[in-house]
Amino acid sequence: MKRTILWSLVAAGSILLNSCNKWLDLQPQDGITRAEFWKTKEDVHAALIGIYSSLNSGPVEQQLFTWGELRADLVGLTSYATDDNRLVKNYNILSTNVIADWSAIYTAINNCNLLIDYAGQAKQADPTFTEAEYNTDLGEALAVRSFLYFYLVRTFRDIPLKLKGTSKDTDIVSVGQSTGDEVLKQIEKDLLQALDWIPEYHVNTSGYNATNAGRVTRPAVRAMLADVYLWLEQYDKVEEQTAKILETGRYSLIGAALPEIFDGGTMETIWELSHKNSSENPMYNIGVTARRPFTANVDILNNEIFPSNEGTDIDLFDSRGEGILYGMSGDLRKYGTESPDYYNFQLYRFSDVMLMRAEALAELGRGTEALALLEDLRTKRKAIRATDPNIEATDLEGIILFVFAERARELTFEGKRWFDLLRLAKKDNYANINVLVDLVTKVVDANVRQSAINKVRDVDSHYLPILETELFKDKQLKQNPFYLK
């Protein structure tokens, strides 16, 4: 009986997901109408399953990866890469490039909006739907929506901010555009609300639990808030949120056995997308198969991120460098070991929180505490002396650069590198713009390098264009001015 109920919920969630797959142009497919759905708490739970299913869909997960990696330095291209991929890598992005396709992300956002809009209707109709269950479902939908908007705002800056769902023809409206600052304020507001509604954990257990790792928990919301506050350069709030995660005592580093993190089952995971029991891993085709478009940038990884050790430790290796490459093939095999199609995509894990906290502490003048966190992480990962800058606690800028170097080692191929480099570059009103100039110098083909350097000095170029087809659909959308030149 339990199996039947579970599959019914999954099926209903799938129908909901598919019924709204044209959100941004606001053309609903009227699969499940308001009158037919939203009558019981099971309907709301099914909608929540649909939300998480939309995150695991190929287009969403692949866009999270490409937005966070393709313009950076750790992922390169193979001969199977598309022309659009090559244009992105050479910083010659057009408004027709598929990297600017946000439709799958907005479909997932619409699923969140529908739950937020109509869960109250189910609560009124179903007396068994408790206030706690209702708040939890709403909180998770708010948190997932915020997570997706945070990716969008860092990728495009000024975007449509849709807070109401589209489920029928009369819902069709032109939503226009909100500034990046407005979007970030909404994200913060929603995450703080979710923090009140979402429980600490969904399953009360001291060890790893797939439900706790696969659904948004209160620590996951705190990790998102810390990430948002880093982007906003509000370091006292980063310190506050990361401290509360550490205070749970629940999370810990497992040491050098990195494949275990991505294979599932460790207490490093705060929030993940699980593919443990499915061979339909959307990352497999773009990073591992023979005709994959993306490859590890082996030269930069081996020479800059994971250089060889020196002196008496010449035979020692950073466990993180050993874990991300399959020999010299360039496969993106961080996500799994012998069977890379069964990886878990880590959205937030404990080491990420430690590094966010270390950065905030350094920005707040607490260099000794920041270095202690870095030392703890490096010791567990068996980091080598060649990557230890031997910084004093008073060298706060040096510590911050050390943190970013450790983020490159720790979070390789996790969809975060471009956003890290952009965040470092734009800090203090773009005081570090040369971070991006140096990046372009390393990754862009020589024949177009100077042109790319000139482009990257324009801060508008750091955000993707609105796809041309979206501009045709909604006349209120305005193109990023860089792409009008």
How would you label these PLM feature ranges?
Residues 138, 145, 152, 218, ...:
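Structural register within alpha-helical repeat arrays
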Residues 20, 64, 76-78, 92, ...:
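Long, intrinsically disordered, low-complexity segments
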Residues 1-28:
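Bacterial Sec-dependent N-terminal signal peptides
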Residues 87, 299-350, 356:
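Flexible, polar/acidic helix-loop-strand segments at domain edges
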Residues 45-46, 53-54, 59, 81-156, ...:
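Conserved, well-structured interaction surfaces
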Residues 20-68, 91-94, 242, 256-261, ...:
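Membrane-proximal, proline-rich intrinsically disordered regions
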Residues 35, 61-82, 162-164, 171, ...:
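Short, surface-exposed recognition loops and adjoining beta-strand edges that mediate ligand/DNA contacts
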